[in-house]
Regions:
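An anion-binding loop in the catalytic cleft
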Residues: 116-206
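A generic structural signal for well-ordered coil/turn residues at beta-strand boundaries
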Residues: 31-34, 45-46, 51, 107-109, ...
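Acyl-group handling in specialized metabolite and lipid biosynthesis
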Residues: 104-117
Length: 206
């Protein structure tokens, strides 16, 4: 009866309960996330929490880099937490249900880029979905994943190629593609891509 089942969840609960907490935190442009060590209860990710550790989310964080940081954080905290439980010093604090948000599983349909989004939202989404399933658009009939991009303040129509540096208009500002991957090809820099692929300023891409 004195066995405690705990779980490490990759968010600061009750924010982002559910299947994709790291991706949703990046996509939502949260400034921080972390881990919660909680007691397992029947309802999803809603058990009382004994420990939080926070970590900041920078503009450079993508799913791959942030999940690595979170794993390292978790492995450093779990030993200490188990000792606290073993010594009967664990205090489990109930979560505030009114603050709960849900990180629903990433759906494949989310990976298609919508140029009507704002540039900062698109960059966040590209980072959140890297490396899988990735964020893609189509150019000359082939599907291209954007693996790295940054926001720029050029303005133009959503989806319009504004500059030969591969800057594309969004509903607010624009993004500059820095790295990308054609279907069946390796990830490459924009410079390498543009050597073998012509882009025409003024073209609207899907």
């Amino acid at each position: 009866s004195n066995i405690t089942f705990i779980n490490i969840h990759a968010s600061i609960l009750p924010r982002w309960r559910g299947a994709a907490p790291i991706q949703r935190a990046i996509m939502n442009m949260d400034k921080e996330t972390g881990i919660s060590i909680m007691k397992i209860v029947p309802k999803l990710d809603s058990g009382p929490v004994m420990k939080f550790e926070k970590i900041s989310i920078t503009n450079e964080c993508n799913y791959q880099t942030l999940s690595k940081k979170i794993s390292l954080l978790a492995s450093s905290v779990i030993t200490e937490s188990l000792e606290i439980i073993e010594n009967n010093n664990a205090k489990f604090i109930p979560q505030d249900e009114s603050k709960a948000t849900y990180a629903k599983k990433i759906d494949k349909s989310e990976s298609k880029i919508n140029w009507n989004d704002k540039a900062n939202q698109l960059v966040a989404k590209i980072n959140a979905l890297y490396p899988n399933p990735g964020s893609w658009f189509t150019l000359n009939g082939s599907r291209i994943k954007i693996t790295k991009a940054k926001e720029t303040n050029n303005t133009g129509k959503p989806g319009e190629i504004l500059d030969n540096r591969f800057i594309i208009g969004c509903s607010h500002n624009s993004i500059e593609i820095l790295e990308l991957q054609k279907e069946g090809k390796k990830n490459m820099s924009k410079t390498d891509f543009l050597k073998g692929n012509k882009i025409k300023i003024g073209t609207i891409i899907d």
